[in-house]
Amino acid sequence: MDALIGDLQERIKASGLPVDLIVVSDHGMIAFKDRNFVALDKMVDLQGVPEVGDHLYPETEAEKEKIYEELKVKDDPRFAVYRLKDVPAQLHYDGNAREGDPVVEPLEAVPVTVHANSAETRSKGDHGWDPQLMPDMKAIFYAEGPDVKPGVKVGTFENVNLYDFVAGLLGLKVGKNDGDKKVLQPVRR
């Protein structure tokens, strides 16, 4: 990856164009600490419950509440369970129905799957954990170019703050979002 980015930097320089280059990841990765995965269908009856990936989409409010209560009572230290409306603000779910309900948040480096026979259980690692709980989930951020101050270092920040930064570099009007434009302001020339 380093060689590819280096090649891109050289090509940008050779072009003579005023290009700002931003290298960012949406998340980190973490190796599973063990194979003691959480299989939701071994904890609660999910027969007939629509799901996509590790998201559950019960069709009625009663089903959502029943699954939530059954998972909550397990009091398993490997995960937290929330109703969608109660997900902690730092996770930026904002009640979006695409997230499913209830929401299961891993608290340890173990896979959380809907089905015990999921391909996920054969994986060696994954992403999706809260970076405040698991530092390996933190993303990378590098920026350089004519609109970026060289040598400026910023601390860890949430990716929701990138929107204002990139829109500003492009001269675009910024819409309402969860980011804080002050976070990356020190990087701008």
Residue ranges, per PLM feature:
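A long, amphipathic alpha-helix that forms part
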Residues: 1-21, 66, 166
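Acidic active-site catalytic centers that drive phospho-/nucleotidyl reactions
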Residues: 2, 26, 161
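Surface-exposed helix-capping loop/turn segments at secondary-structure junctions
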Residues: 9-19, 77-82, 172-178
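Acidic/histidine-rich catalytic neighborhood
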Residues: 18-21, 25-59
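Short loop/turn and capping residues at structural boundaries
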Residues: 23, 35, 85, 177-180
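Active-site neighborhoods of enzymes that stabilize oxyanions during catalysis
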Residues: 51-153, 157-168
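…; additionally, a secondary subgroup of soluble metalloenzymes is captured
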Residues: 152, 161, 165-189
